Amino acid sequence: MRILTLLIGGVLGLAAGAVTALFAAGMIGSGASVGNQISVNGWNSDWTIGSTAANPWTRARVARHGLLALTKEEAVYFTTNIDTDGNRLSENCTYEVSGGDMPGQWWSITLYDATSYLPRNKDNALSFDMTKAAASGDGAAWSFTVAAEGPETGNWVSSHKAGDFDMTLRIYKPTPELIADPEGVLPTPSVKRLACGGDA
């Protein structure tokens, strides 16, 4: 009887440990808040990514979410899964994402599905970047549409087959000011919901 009790206790302990690890790694639920969390107008980051201060949970989340884990001097990452009104981003809706100059040498915004992978579509339109912003006329005041189907005109990032999705802003070679004070320096892109399926 004592052996059975020990076995049951061991199994329960292992199960609890596994669930905790998966949760912290972001493989179930939304993940634990670990590391040095930064949040600016719904765009979130972890300032320990790419540093020796990153603990195992942070490193597991980085691996899960496909970030390159460069040092902050090389690149910083901000992710959002909500629009400017706080609603979850969804393939069923159309959004306008807009912004201006970013404090770094180059930047990009990429869309990922609910499993943190690129959506499985063939639209060849999963990101927008500084080069495209400059090519469209004004790199200091840019915008693009996020929708499952492309607009007749303008820049487009496809959410087709993305379900509930998020977007990651990468800023390469960020300025020292951004590294020192991200909350005060980052000019966060606006994510405005224009319409959703079923809207009149």
Predicted regions and their residues:
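A compositional/structural signature for long, glycine/proline-rich flexible linkers
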Residues: 1-200
